[in-house]
């Protein structure tokens, strides 16, 4: 079943959840542990309490219900189900076993797990939700629900639901709703209202197709509304052309919003939770510089970020594509920060922003011991800091200024008296080092980016 967009955080709070993961060929034990820890944080963000974890090593997800027969019964014992998959479920053959063989490993059907049910446990205390750390098919979700008696969510559905809960601006809500409907459409057969449709196969299929058509029409309507908003965004971006722009990019909960607040003094939302920020915020670096430097905070990334969400948030991610400098913000205290950085680079590569100049910012250094800090300092082109330390923020601000200063050139400009109205444009986008007057107009000695100089010369010609 897809997660309901109307399920509130309060309704979920206190509900128990079991995490399920299949370790596929090529996935190390360390990678699996990191993925499950991250899934646990995602599930907790939705308000659930994680009480057990069931894992299994397989060549591929079981076609019927994700897990093999024995491990499925173990999971059902935890949730109070019977552990029986409806007959007629298809089997699937894959080439994955060859990968295990090439690695010299054997893929056992069952892997022992410490999470076993308590004898005589009250059904009211049993987990009501199963969360699978893979994107699964509607039939797999249905079979897993029947075998365990619990609601089933997959990783994609969890992320989509978190985005739905945290979207605040109209643009973000439209983007998330498009992604949610794309996720829900193929899962309509799983809806709880399907009993009447099952009376006749033909009638049921017709009803489902009608619902899907309604969803397609709704998506088209939402995309029209989103296009209008994005046109306004593009107009604002066009107005900002020629300005110095820095984009904060990175994994979710890396501390981008905290850095945004520290650099700009703006009261942006700062919360210690995944995907607290979905809306792009643009503010000026403080204290203000001449020319102004604009800082933008962007949506965070995560491993296995659903493609529909990446597509929906493409216009938001374009802030990174159009920036002069990217600050890759990384939570240095997270043991998996190297892998998180690779996820960030991969997403930015997907949108064509891999060649934008960048600076690596290892944040949350206040959580590191001296040895860990010393090890990180050996990295090149890296700043190690804490967004809560004013000295570190000052150092980051200076690094930003130095980046732009290094790209500026010094030139002479003549502003004719007939075009004195352009003086404001010059002062806004360049550093004016000297100003004098003669019979032809105002002569200025300025420092600015080459592109800015070229634009000003064209306007003054």
Indicate residue ranges for each PLM-predicted region.
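Long, well-ordered amphipathic alpha-helical subdomains in the mid-to-C-terminal portions
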Residues: 403-452
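Conserved G1/Walker A P-loop phosphate-binding module
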Residues: 2, 8-17, 27, 191, ...
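Residue-level signature of catalytic and energy-coupling elements of molecular machines
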Residues: 39, 130, 181, 215, ...
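Flexible beta-alpha connector loops of hexameric P-loop NTPases
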Residues: 26-31, 60-65, 166-172, 206-207, ...
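Canonical P-loop GTPase G-domain recognition
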Residues: 147-199, 203, 354-359, 364-417
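Short amphipathic alpha-helices in soluble, non-transmembrane regions
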Residues: 399, 425-429, 456-461
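Conserved Switch II/interswitch segment of TRAFAC-class P-loop GTPases
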Residues: 23-28, 58, 62, 131-138, ...
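N-terminal accessory targeting/assembly segments
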Residues: 1-155
């Amino acid at each position: 079943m897809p997660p309901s967009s109307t399920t509130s955080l309060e309704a979920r709070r206190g509900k128990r959840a079991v995490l399920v993961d299949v370790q596929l060929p090529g996935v190390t034990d360390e990678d699996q542990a990191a993925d499950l820890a991250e899934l646990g944080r995602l599930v907790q963000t939705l308000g659930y309490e994680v009480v057990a974890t069931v894992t299994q090593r397989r060549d591929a997800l079981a076609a019927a219900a994700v897990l093999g027969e024995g491990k499925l019964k173990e999971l059902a014992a935890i949730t109070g189900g019977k552990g029986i998959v409806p007959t007629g479920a298809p089997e699937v053959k894959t080439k994955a076993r060859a990968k295990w063989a090439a690695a010299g490993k054997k893929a056992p059907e069952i892997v022992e797990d410490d999470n076993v049910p308590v004898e005589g446990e009250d059904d009211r205390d049993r987990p009501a939700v199963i969360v699978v750390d893979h994107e699964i098919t509607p039939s797999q979700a249905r079979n897993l629900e029947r075998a365990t008696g619990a609601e089933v969510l997959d990783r994609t559905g969890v992320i989509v639901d978190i985005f739905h809960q945290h979207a605040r601006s109209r643009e973000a809500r439209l983007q998330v709703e498009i992604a949610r409907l794309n996720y829900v459409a193929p899962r309509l057969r799983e809806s709880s209202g399907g009993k009447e449709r099952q009376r006749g196969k033909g009638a049921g299929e017709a009803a489902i197709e009608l619902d899907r058509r309604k969803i397609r029409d709704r998506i088209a309507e939402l995309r029209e509304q989103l296009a209008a908003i994005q046109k306004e965004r593009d107009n604002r971006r066009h107005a900002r052309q020629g300005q110095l722009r820095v984009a904060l990019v990175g994994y979710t909960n890396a501390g981008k919003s905290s850095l945004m607040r520290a650099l700009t003094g703006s009261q942006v939302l700062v919360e210690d939770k995944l995907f607290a920020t979905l809306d792009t915020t643009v503010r000026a670096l403080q204290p203000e510089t001449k020319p102004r430097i604009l800082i933008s905070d962007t949506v965070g990334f995560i491993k296995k970020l659903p493609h529909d969400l990446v597509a929906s948030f493409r216009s938001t991610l374009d802030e990174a594509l159009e920036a002069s400098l990217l600050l890759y913000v990384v939570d240095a205290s997270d043991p998996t920060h190297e892998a998180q950085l690779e996820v960030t680079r991969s997403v930015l590569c997907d949108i064509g922003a891999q060649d934008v100049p960048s600076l690596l910012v290892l944040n949350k250094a206040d959580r590191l011991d001296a040895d860990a800090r010393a090890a990180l300092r050996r990295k090149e082109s890296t700043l190690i800091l804490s967004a809560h330390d004013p000295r570190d923020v000052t150092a980051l601000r200076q690094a930003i200024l130095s980046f732009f200063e290094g790209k500026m050139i010094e030139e002479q400009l003549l502003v004719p008296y007939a075009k004195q109205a352009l003086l404001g444009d010059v002062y806004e986008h360049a550093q004016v080092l000297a100003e004098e007057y003669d019979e032809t107009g105002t002569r200025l000695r300025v420092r600015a980016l080459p592109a800015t100089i070229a634009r000003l010369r064209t306007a003054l010609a």
